Amino acid sequence: MSDLVKVTLPDGSQKEAPRGTPVIDFVKGQIGPGLAKAAYFARLDGEPVDLSRAIERDARLEIVTTRNPEALEVARHDAAHVMASVVQKLYPGTQVTIGPAIEDGFYYDFARETPFTPEDLERIEKATNEAIKADLPFVRSEISMEAALALFEGMGERYKVEIVKDIAAKGAKTLTLYKHGDWVDFCLGPHGPSTGRIGVVKLLNVAGAYWRGDAKNAMLQRIYGTAFFDKKELDAHLAKLEEVKKRDHRRLGPQLGLFTFHEFAPGAPFWLPAGTVLYNVLEDAMRRLVLKNGYQEVKTPLLFNKRLWETSGHWGKYRENMFLVVDSESDPALPLEDRCSFSLKPMNCPSHHLIYRMDKRSYRELPVRYFTTDALHRNEASGSLGGLTRVRQFEQDDAHIYLREEQVTDEVLRIFELMKVVYGAFGLGFEATFSTRPEQRIGDDALWDRAEALLRKSLDATGLKWTLNAGDGAFYGPKIDMLVTDSLGRKWQTCTIQLDYAAPERFDLTFVGEDNKEHRPVVIHRAIYGSFERFVAILVEHYAGAFPAWLAPVQARVVTVSDRFEAWAREAGEALQARGWRVEVDASSDKLGAKIRNAQLAKIPFTLVVGEKEVEAKGVSPRRHGGEDLKTMPLETFAELMAREATAPF
């Protein structure tokens, strides 16, 4: 064996180095000190590794610098380790569990009887940043599972012991440890060279979290934080977080009279008058769009016998997420679960399959497109509920399309065109992910191979860039998920396009082909908004509650300078209402400034001032939300303005 290894760089060039050379030494000696200084971790043949990793074989080498967002993700994981070490030093007896990097930050879960206070958080943050400045190296090692178990048992870390045992049960023989100073944790890595490279850390908040996400387990304390290489970047991020707080739909929704919740119906929103208008505008717009694009609207029952869910596979794969209903005619002596032979529907697809199956179908009819906005119920864990983004009762702009296999690509392209119309109307950017077969699934591998290949081909045909999300498909088929980007640059999952070969088999769905023989259709499951509830949450935060005129619950409010002008104010308001616009009149005794301010706080797109000159001109003086005053104009001119700006774009 040669004592030299060949290292291939991203530009295709090759360099030689002594076998066993650490990556960082290779970079310093063969590339240059500038790259070595900027390097945070590396990839050897695509595998993320520490800069201290020895190059033992011919390999492709990529250096990841602090300019790469992936380096910041690793630095945040580094920060989680440092914070955990600080917590255990400041609060002896605290048990550590897990601490990953997450989007925009990191967290670590701790087991401690006494809750962390805001003062504790400040103390931990200060000590964490001091520990970072100590610039301690991260040192990687590997030990046997037996040694790892003995190590963490000796440390009294019962949660770590539990994880080690689980890893060993899966067949692992060794465990990777990372140590900085005298603190050690097991971790796949990679980590940065030393704590001093992390940058600056800010701790954000403390929240409760069940061990392993199970409400039956102990409640832990989760400390959230973030880290940036540069303080200016941190300050900009914190300013963004403040803006996010201001836009939080859980605050703005009730404030604007859109929705609320009640303890008697956890996870089920109450839509207030303004919110109901908003909801209906969204629903009506989508209905118009799909009906003129070949869809047929259907409605199906809310409650179904379990035989439907056994046929679809939900009873075996999804039952824990369903609301089960006791059959009143069942034997009371039976166990409760055996008496539950009905369920509220968590999905529309099985009932749509029943409709499709009611008639004999010809290939000439396909695609058959069913659309609905029926209510759905899913038994989400109480701890996961949050505003409108995670609820138990919701509606979707749900559609199921029955078609021949050769029609799939064209149909996916049609769906993408609808999606572009919808997201474009809201000014939302978008990108796609492709999710493949999960561990829990129905159908054989050959069927999944076929479905994944076809959906991948269809996604490629759109020309849209996409990323792979392996193992996250639905239990019955692969899917395309759309991530929309809001005005703050945040990404939200909305649209889904799922390809299903299994349902036609399970429900015996057929069509008569050109050969006069029966064939199986393919089913596409698709939604563009996703759930209305989640989409409303996105829009509230995207617009900060200041909806465009076509979407706003109240599009214009007429305000009087004094009660002398009430008659014309009401006449103008009624004339606009007669044209279909959503208009209110404020003829209260409040001063004009207060009326205008109230309209601005309510985020109404147009405030129409009516005083003496407006009465004389039979007009109004519009003021846009945000402060732009338009000149006094005849009422008819304003109605034309409304027609341009307040008409639904789809």
Swiss-Prot record:
Say which domain of life the source belongs to: Bacteria
Q: Give the GO biological process terms.
A: threonyl-tRNA aminoacylation
A molecular-function term among this protein's GO annotations: threonine-tRNA ligase activity
Where would you say this protein principally sits, based on its record?
Answer: cytoplasm
Documented EC number(s): 6.1.1.3
Cofactor(s), names only, from the UniProt record: Zn(2+)
Q: Which residues form the TGS domain?
A: 3-65
Ranges for region Catalytic:
248-548
User: What compartments host this protein?
Assistant: Cytoplasm
**For binding Zn(2+), which residues are annotated in this chain's numbering?**
349, 400, 525
Q: Which Pfam families match?
A: HGTP_anticodon (PF03129), TGS (PF02824), tRNA-synt_2b (PF00587), tRNA_SAD (PF07973)
Q: Which reaction does it catalyse?
A: tRNA(Thr) + L-threonine + ATP = L-threonyl-tRNA(Thr) + AMP + diphosphate + H(+)
**GO cellular component entries:** cytoplasm
Keywords on this record?
A: Aminoacyl-tRNA synthetase, ATP-binding, Cytoplasm, Ligase, Metal-binding, Nucleotide-binding, Protein biosynthesis, RNA-binding, tRNA-binding, Zinc
Q: How is the cofactor bound?
A: Binds 1 zinc ion per subunit.
Q: Which family does it belong to?
A: Belongs to the class-II aminoacyl-tRNA synthetase family.
Q: What does this protein do?
A: Catalyzes the attachment of threonine to tRNA(Thr) in a two-step reaction: L-threonine is first activated by ATP to form Thr-AMP and then transferred to the acceptor end of tRNA(Thr). Also edits incorrectly charged L-seryl-tRNA(Thr).
Quaternary context: Homodimer.
Official protein name in the record: Threonine--tRNA ligase
Q: What is the lineage of its organism?
A: Bacteria, Pseudomonadati, Myxococcota, Myxococcia, Myxococcales
